[in-house]
Amino acid sequence: LVSSELKGLEGFATAYGQFPPGHYFYSRDKDFTRWYIRDWMQYDNVKDNPASVEELHDALEAAVRRHLMSDVPYGVLLSGGLDSSIISAITKKYAARRVEDQERSEAWWPQLHSFAVGLKGAPDLVAAKKVADYIGTVHHEINYTIEEGLDAIRDVIYYIETYDVTTVRASTPMYLLARVIKSMGIKMVLSGEGADEVFGGYLYFHKAPDAKAFHEETVRKLSKLYMYDCLRA
């Protein structure tokens, strides 16, 4: 039996396991086989690659633009940090025109909405508002209380299906924010998730003994995103 959520298997089996992303399962082999393998996962394949800020800029902009091919209203999650601010700025650049027809016609919803969530007075909210004002989004600041956060924890755990403390803590405000976004009719949002894993943005990356260890840790973090940060997203 296979289900997209653990709760869908309740009552049908006595043992459960994860179906890892990038794998397929063949019953005859009784094991998972990895099919998603890219050259860049191996350090030796990338160690001599030249670094190009221009190519990185163009690739990121193209990736964001590609994800704006949407027939439903979309927005951006804007925390005020570097990752989400860059994604929001690129999205705003293309939001007024339909990317499906090479910007020949206006978008059905030309005003880009940005969203930030936090306790009242949180510094992240101040930073998010500054970015929103600068790039020109219709900004929504969602405040919640500690009591509201505590009340939501049971539902959060039900949906993300983990008791991991860090994941639950990060998912709780996201859950409260998602309810507001849904009520506004926004069907899709872009965020800055994954940037720290790709670029080694976490503080402990500074302790990497060499470039090979740094690269291998970024690949490992990317492979585990589905278990942690992508759960909250």
Language-model regions: role of each:
Residues 29-30, 129-233:
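Glycine-rich active-site loop/lid subdomains used to bind and stabilize high-energy intermediates
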Residues 1-163, 174:
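Cysteine-centered catalytic environments shared across enzyme families
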